[in-house]
């Protein structure tokens, strides 16, 4: 089967999420904003304490914090942090003694997240421009890695999970919500950059997704379905035909695993 042109994909994803940053009230394949966050399980009282601009740009596919179980003083990395809602939410959970680093490769998203977090006085949050396949962070520097609706956008998911293992301390948690499929996607979908950017074309089969996590040095503690629906008819049709859906995954880095890759 043919594969997606990575350069075209990267350009399309950056274009899509630049628009999300600049026009959060625009029309997209996916739902956004506070109503989505509350339906997925976010605490309304804590949402009230977050920057409104970050909440209105939220485009996640699940509630990772029920799995992450963050506690005061922990170090967290958010892969694909967007405009920063999850990173800011995590900052309130880990407190002033903790630290949250958000990673995103869209410059407009990073700039917006920095402005919003600074205005909210969240000094324990930092946003770095970078790729989730090459996380700009040192080895074994985090207690938990979170990600929400982003890994499906990567053309190299095994590398993402290897990088997550690298930055986690032994016994650290990987708590993610993402898009997977029950059946293989046809070639025309896999090669469609628009459908990748809409969080459909890059959906891995669920069993392949789980195997990639395990191969990176994690023990999968559980996988759960999320209540999530697409907006556009084209996206809904693909979802219905191939079983494209949102799931949440909790995995724990093996105590003996040190991950692979570089240190920064």
Regions found by a protein language model. Give the residues of each.
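N-terminal auxiliary segments of SAM/dcSAM-dependent transferases
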Residues: 1-40
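C-terminal lobe and adjacent flexible extensions of AdoMet/dcAdoMet transferase-like proteins
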Residues: 18-23, 212, 216-264
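Conserved alpha-helix/loop element of class I SAM-dependent methyltransferases that forms part
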Residues: 30-75, 86-93
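A short acidic, Gly/Pro-enriched loop at the edge of an enzyme's catalytic core
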Residues: 72, 133-144
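Conserved SAM/SAH-binding beta-strand->alpha-helix loop
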Residues: 106-108
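Conserved SAM-binding strand-loop segment of SAM-dependent methyltransferases
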Residues: 120-133
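A short glycine-rich, Lys/Arg-flanked "PGG" loop and its adjoining helix->strand segment in the class I
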Residues: 158-173
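Short, glycine-/aromatic-enriched active-site segment of Class I SAM-dependent methyltransferases
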Residues: 180-200
């Amino acid at each position: 089967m043919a594969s997606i042109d990575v350069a075209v994909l990267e350009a399309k994803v950056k274009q899509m999420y630049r628009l999300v940053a600049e026009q959060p009230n625009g029309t997209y394949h996916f739902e956004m904003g506070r109503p989505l966050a509350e339906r997925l399980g976010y605490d309304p009282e804590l949402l009230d304490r977050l920057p409104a601009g970050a909440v209105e740009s939220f485009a996640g596919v699940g509630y990772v914090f029920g799995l992450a179980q963050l506690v005061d003083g922990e170090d967290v990395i958010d892969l694909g942090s967007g405009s920063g809602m999850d990173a800011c939410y995590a900052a309130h959970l880990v407190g002033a003694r903790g630290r949250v680093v958000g990673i995103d490769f869209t410059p407009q998203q990073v700039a917006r997240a920095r402005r919003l977090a600074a205005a909210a006085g969240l000094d324990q949050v930092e946003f770095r421009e970078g790729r989730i396949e090459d996380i700009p962070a040192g080895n074994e520097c985090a207690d938990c890695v979170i990600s929400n609706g982003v890994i499906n956008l990567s053309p190299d998911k095994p590398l993402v999970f290897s990088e997550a293992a690298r930055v986690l301390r032994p016994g650290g948690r990987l708590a993610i919500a993402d898009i997977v499929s029950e059946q293989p996607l046809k070639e025309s979908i896999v090669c469609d950059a628009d459908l990748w950017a809409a969080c459909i074309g890059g959906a891995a089969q669920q069993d392949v997704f789980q195997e990639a996590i395990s191969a990176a040095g994690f023990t999968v503690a559980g996988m759960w379905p999320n209540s999530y629906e697409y907006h556009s008819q084209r996206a809904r049709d693909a979802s219905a035909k191939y079983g494209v859906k949102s799931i949440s995954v909790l995995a724990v880095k093996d105590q003996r695993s040190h991950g692979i890759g570089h240190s920064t």
